[in-house]
A protein has these predicted regions:
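A conserved FAD-binding loop/helix module that cradles the flavin
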Residues: 54, 58-101, 106
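A sequence-level detector of short, solvent-exposed, charge-rich linear segments
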Residues: 33-37, 42, 48-49, 75-78, ...
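A Rossmann-like FAD-binding core segment of flavoenzymes
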Residues: 1-33, 91-106
Length: 120
């Protein structure tokens, strides 16, 4: 694979790049890999994975589940461990070490705290 920057720099890698990132948000760069919700945000499964491109995950403030918005500064970061566990499990790798994130309040897999009275 060859990745070319907007400045013409070229980087070669033997593995498919995992992250498409930019200041506008990565969801715009990979929008063709996601079904869209009626509100224009990507449709995700419970593990923040695309419903049409298995193995493609979305992290960041564009993540939405039902009417829950994962705030830009803090809450969306709590979903990183959820994605990491899903990837590790799919590869047959141990994921128990990710539980340490839960003890620090950085493992958000229970969305019941995301309602009207957001705890963050």
């Amino acid at each position: 694979y060859e990745v070319v920057t907007e400045f013409g720099e070229s980087f070669t890698t033997g593995v498919q790049p995992l992250l498409a990132h930019g200041f506008e948000g990565s969801q715009k760069l990979v929008s063709n890999l996601f079904e869209m919700r009626e509100d224009g945000f990507p449709l995700l499964n419970d593990n923040d994975e695309s419903t049409i491109a298995p193995g493609m995950f979305l992290c960041g403030p564009a993540v939405r589940h039902n009417d829950f918005i994962f705030c830009f500064i803090y809450k969306y970061r709590q979903r990183f461990a959820v994605v990491a566990k899903t990837i590790a499990t799919s590869l047959g790798l141990p994921a128990e070490g990710l539980e340490v994130y839960r003890s620090y309040g950085m493992y958000l897999d229970d969305l019941s705290c995301c309602g009207e009275a957001c705890v963050c």
